[in-house]
Amino acid sequence: MPDTNPIDIAAAWFRHATNRDTDAVMALAADAVEVGGARGSGTGRELLREWIDRSRAEMTPTRWFARGDLVVVEYEAVWRNRAGRDMGRRVMIVTFRVEDGRIAGIYRHDDLAASLTINGLDAGDAIEAPDAA
């Protein structure tokens, strides 16, 4: 039986996205997944696929927050050139909304406090990082 725990699903997303396993990322998403970020928002798995394919960043989760079907993760993104040299780093935030065991919404933010507030979470919703993250 597939895992339906929102935290485990978010951890799996990071694993698959960092390993560039786009098909595995797509298997976690609902057909009408909402995708939002700096470049706007939209709906659908193809939009998520384009986002993952375009990202090309190594993502290391640093802080996790969760309540119900929402998971907010602060992570460090690192971009490298073909030789493996560090081309830039940035702390980013992503929110996962999980429904019926699938990612129904994924939203990128630049500010952790704002992301927590928007989603009705706060510092009290901090959790230990999952083992698989």
Which stretches of residues belong to each language-model region?
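A solvent-exposed, acidic/Ser-Thr-rich amphipathic alpha-helical stretch
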Residues: 2, 22-70
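Short, aromatic-enriched amphipathic alpha-helices that serve as compact interaction elements
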Residues: 2-20
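A beta-strand edge to alpha-helix "cap/lid" segment located at domain peripheries
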Residues: 5, 9, 49-133
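Short stretches within intrinsically disordered, low-complexity N-terminal or propeptide regions
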Residues: 12, 19, 31, 128-131
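Short, flexible active-site loop motifs that bind/organize anionic cofactors or intermediates
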Residues: 12-15, 38, 105
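Alpha-helix C-capping/helix-to-loop hinge sites
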Residues: 16, 35-36, 79
